[in-house]
Amino acid sequence: MKIVSWHPVLTDHQSYTLEALQQAATCPLTVYVAKAEHPARQLQGWVNRHTASLSPQLIPQKGWFKYIVRQLRAHRDAIHLFGSPFEQPKLIVTLLLAAAMGLRVFLISEPYSPISAGYQNDRLKLINRAKAVLRPVLYRCYGALLSRRIAGVFAISPLAAIQYRGIGIAGKKIFPFGYFVPRSERLCSKTPAADSEKTGLKLIFIGTLIERKGLDVLIEAVRSLNRTELLVTLDVYGSGDSSQFDLDQAAVRYCGLIPFGEAQAVIADYDALVLPSRYDGWGVVVNEALMAGVPVICSDRAGAGAVVEKWQCGAIFASEDAPDLTGKLNEWLRAPESLAKMRLAARNAGAALDPDVAGRYMLDVLSFDTKQPAPSCPWYDYD
């Protein structure tokens, strides 16, 4: 087996999984990227720390079309993986060429956003509204071109699976997937301990300070719970303009950025992480929390919520519904012992989210005989 993986840019939550796949398959794995870095992610504090074994090759700016044709021809006998295939025009062209050449192609894809809120910022609102209208149309076109030509889709979240079925990809070609990061070495000697006499809730939010992330909904819920006394505190971490939110620096504090790679160690000191997104294709911060053994409350529009639901390591609330979120948090205030059980469940879920598990699962999918039952998903329930 030979594997070639194409990406707009390679980030840690993809590279760890590819390295695990390479180790599980004990085969050559070549990585091509359209960009070496993602400017928006860099502003958020992301750092690319690719393992030496991957050594991504940058697609040149000049002569890129001839370059990709040459690489596709040179790797005719390989399995071609396309991560976030519709994010970058060069990758779309490469994917269509690979499919037209009859190569064995798998997509690794989040769902497209069904809302108009910006993905990285809140600017260009009119353009974002137009994109929200056009996305379903574009994906139906992709489906018409690719449904019979690709071998499969690693669908990142149940919503991605639903969307790909909706554009004509056969259910037997869709394999549930996610994003994966390893457990921090700093946690090896740090086991979260529950305090049975402790009162109140200490919450953490990590994310870009934009409308899509739903921080305003979380702040409203915290304010509601603290009407008569200070029961809940919320620490907010992330890039963006904190002045647009109601942060009193008492119950709700802005704490700046977490140094890249330190999220799990920081999260471990909290009772729960909250991801109140209006939409999140996955939400890697959920992985970080579960790796740290910390329960998660997230909206029903966050892809990683499927993991929380299956492993019962937190709670799900209706997106944009502050009263529903308030009710879920209030249940934890009234029954703090439930958090202790959820911490254990979180650690179990975190173990399942290890990149090594994902790498072995990918290998099983790439190797399995379509006449046999598909490999079972280790992370969440899927029909």
Residue spans for each PLM region:
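Donor nucleotide-sugar binding/catalytic pocket of nucleotide-sugar-dependent glycosyltransferases
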Residues: A132-P192, E197-K198
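Conserved acidic donor-binding segment of nucleotide-sugar-dependent glycosyltransferases
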Residues: K310-W311, A315-A322, E331-P336
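Short alpha-helical donor nucleotide-sugar binding micro-motif in glycosyltransferases
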Residues: L257-I258, A265-Y270
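Conserved donor-binding/catalytic core segment of Leloir-type glycosyltransferases
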Residues: A193-K213, I219-V222
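A short, well-ordered alpha-helix in the C-terminal region of glycosyltransferases
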Residues: S338-A352
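Aromatic "clamp/platform" in nucleotide-sugar-dependent glycosyltransferases that forms part
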Residues: R278
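Short hydrophobic beta-strand element within catalytic cores of glycosyltransferases
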Residues: P295-C298
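Nucleotide-activated donor-binding/catalytic signature segment of Leloir-type glycosyltransferases, i.e.
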Residues: S243-G261
